[in-house]
Amino acid sequence: MANPTLFVSYDQNGKKLSFANWISVLSPQDTPFVSMTGKESINQTIFSWQTDALASVDGNNAHVEGSRAEDGEMKPTVIKSNVTQILRKVVRVSDTANTTANYGRGRELMYQLEKKGKEIKRDLEKILLSGQARTDVLADQYLTNSATDPAVVGLNDTHAARKTGAFQFLCAHGGLAGGVVDKTKNGPADPDTGAVTVKVAQNASNPTTNIGFDEADIFDMTLQLYTAGSEADIIMINPAHAKIFAGLQENTQGSRKRIFENTKQFIYEVNSITDPLGQSYKIIVNRWMPTDAVYFFRSADWTQMVLRAPKRTELAKDGSYEKWMIEMEVGLRHRNPYASGVLFTAAGKVAA
């Protein structure tokens, strides 16, 4: 004691800690795509659906009075299919850790299970929005999503993990590269309308820039979707693309300007656009979106096919701990390959 006649806090022993009884988790937990798309229960790992198209418009559909009715051409429906994917998280907590009292939580096991539940939902969001190709040891026995691009086969390995075809794979893409959709190629044209709904951005207004897209690319995609008969009303973007959409409010030619009259607010955000055809799109920023793609879609056209909903299962106890598993099995279905659009940013585009 520096001063034996004055007892200060530094001289105290056995002081009670001042510890906040809460835990701050800053990690983002929002999952827009998983939250906005519907769910449907299934009872098989492989699920299928059918698509069809009308015959081309016949501008010469005129016939002589009293003529014989000739047979017309008819085509069968097209079968599409995808598979479910198993997502899993495991928690193991010692009996001692699960018994001790802690600040900010009750039992350690329950806290860790809650965290893993949120993590598996984020994993699902990231996977479904990727370019992941369908992978299945039986993929060669079922019709696939593109006649020019069969699904990846798991080398006939019975232990290969199934992977559900994700967003880009279920759109009319232009091929695969290393087990994911090739981002350097346009997709095939719709046989019915000629629309191309998976495209690489040209970024024509910035020909010396090797990445990005511009207004012309955006409205070209909305035109392609209109031509295909799509009812897309959402544009989902990575946060890095928000500035490009905000730039639609003005242009360098001076023919379009933002007006800040009688206001002290500076608003740079663009949260919806209406294209020259009168189609309105809501812009949704999603941190789990690929940085090299922009998606145009209607949420009702996408469905999570759930074989097993997320479930907590206690595993066998063979030591002084508790071990639990959270597991789910789900796949993705797209109503029609041409119902949604993918605009790949012009990565690697050679300057003109």
Swiss-Prot record:
Entry annotated with the keyword Lipoprotein: no
Keyword entries, A-Z: Capsid protein, Late protein, Virion
Subcellular location: Virion
Superkingdom to which the source organism belongs: Viruses
GO cellular component terms, semicolon-separated: viral capsid
Pfam families, alphabetized: SU10_MCP (PF17236)
Annotated signal sequence range: none
Function recorded in the entry: Assembles to form a prolate capsid of about 145 nm x 44 nm.
Protein name per Swiss-Prot or TrEMBL: Major capsid protein
Lineage of the organism: Viruses, Duplodnaviria, Heunggongvirae, Uroviricota, Caudoviricetes
